[in-house]
């Protein structure tokens, strides 16, 4: 009987957790001072609340998207070109905006960046990247190649 309940519990987790992972988590929104755009889906914001000796900046990775890599991380010339375009799009969107906010969800799986979204004049950067073809939805599954 214990094995039965364990199997039912395991099956429940297998069905529920993937669905939960794709939902947008609850976050906290703050006004943001954007320091720089690292790439299409990573933006560095000022974080003066961090204690010394930490650098007063946080890298925010846009939750739920994958943009092409650029530079040495690109797998092919096409991905590098697309990565440069995604970065340019993000830079332009930030530069044109007058109200910048960040929604923070938590640390990414590696702990070096915070997962979140950037809201520019009331519009989600995540949505803008996907809508304009510079990003794909991504929730941890195997990534699709940008090289085809």
Over which residues does each language-model region extend?
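Bacterial N-terminal signal peptides
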Residues: 7-16
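Positively charged n-region of N-terminal signal peptides that target proteins for export
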Residues: 1-4
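Intrinsically disordered and other compositionally biased segments
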Residues: 6-7, 94
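Small beta-barrel nucleic-acid-binding modules, primarily SNase/OB-fold domains
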Residues: 17-148
């Amino acid at each position: 009987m214990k094995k039965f309940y364990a199997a039912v519990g395991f099956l429940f987790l297998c069905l529920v957790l993937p669905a939960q992972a794709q939902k947008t988590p609850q976050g906290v929104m703050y006004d943001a001072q954007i320091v720089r755009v690292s790439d299409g889906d990573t933006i560095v914001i000022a974080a003066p609340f961090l204690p010394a000796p930490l650098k007063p900046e946080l890298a925010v990775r846009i939750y739920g998207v994958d943009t092409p890599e650029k530079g040495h991380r690109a797998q092919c010339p096409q991905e590098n070109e697309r990565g440069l375009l995604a970065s340019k799009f993000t830079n332009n969107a930030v530069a044109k905006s007058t109200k910048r906010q960040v929604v923070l969800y938590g640390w990414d799986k590696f702990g070096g960046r915070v997962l979140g979204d950037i809201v520019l004049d009331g519009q989600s950067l995540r949505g803008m990247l996907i809508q304009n073809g510079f990003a794909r939805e991504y929730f941890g599954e195997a990534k699709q190649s940008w090289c085809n």
